[in-house]
Regions:
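Short, functional N-terminal and low-complexity linear motifs
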Residues: 39-42, 61-64, 107, 170-173
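Substrate-binding N-lobe of the ribokinase-like
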Residues: 48-107
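Glycine-rich phosphate/dinucleotide-binding loop and adjoining beta-alpha-beta core of small-molecule
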Residues: 1-34, 85-190
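A near-ubiquitous, low-amplitude feature marking generic local secondary-structure context
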Residues: 24, 35, 39-42, 59, ...
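Long, highly charged low-complexity segments
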Residues: 27-52, 114
Length: 190
């Protein structure tokens, strides 16, 4: 089945891949190898400053779902981003700042952070952010202000499916990556 909208996925290929790999991890299939990863992720030179390694904004987390934000913020740092800012509810600042002290926090409820989205090199949206029309409107606003690379995951995808016209707001953008789990993928393709 071919789906044409803001993205294109050959769902039959995904099913075929699962069948052929027998559910093995990608690293066990030879599709992703350590030698390939080493060509993509390189050791950072010692003399480089963190400000030269990219700025990432993570819009994630909510009361009761701080862990999702901790994991995604930490992942951005481990993947090499020099400066990572998390836009989260103020109530979870202490959790994030203890778990990922290298990251900075901004209050997602104070729309002030939207003025500076363009200074980032990439944005991650969704993990644990919660699902509501207000969250969908926030995603819409971020996408209207930022034309760089965006990764939308978890609750971000659910918000697109529930309150938007799925991927309609992504049309014309080539730099958006959706990372659905099987249930989210079903909602996107439904």
């Amino acid at each position: 089945m071919q789906v044409d909208s803001a993205f294109s996925i050959d769902y039959d290929f995904v099913k075929e891949l699962k069948t052929r790999t027998g559910g093995k991890k990608m690293s066990e299939t030879g599709l992703t190898t350590l030698s390939y990863v080493n060509t993509v992720i390189r050791e950072r030179p010692r003399e480089i400053h963190k400000g030269q390694c990219g700025r990432v904004l993570i819009v994630a987390g909510s009361v009761g779902m701080a862990g999702a934000c901790v994991l995604s913020t930490g992942a951005a740092l481990r993947c090499g981003a020099g400066l990572v800012k998390a836009a989260v509810p103020e109530e979870i600042f202490p959790i994030l700042q203890i778990a990922v002290p290298q990251a900075t926090c901004t209050n997602v409820s104070d729309r002030e952070f939207l003025r500076s989205v363009s200074v980032h090199d990439a944005i991650g949206i969704g993990p644990g952010m919660g699902v509501s029309e207000k969250k969908y409107k926030l995603i819409e606003e971020i996408l209207s202000l930022f034309d760089g690379p965006v990764v939308i995951d978890a609750d971000g995808i659910t918000n697109l499916c529930r309150f938007g016209k799925k991927t309609e707001i992504l049309k014309g953008r080539e730099n958006v990556v959706l990372t659905p789990h099987p249930g989210e993928c079903d909602r996107l393709l439904d």
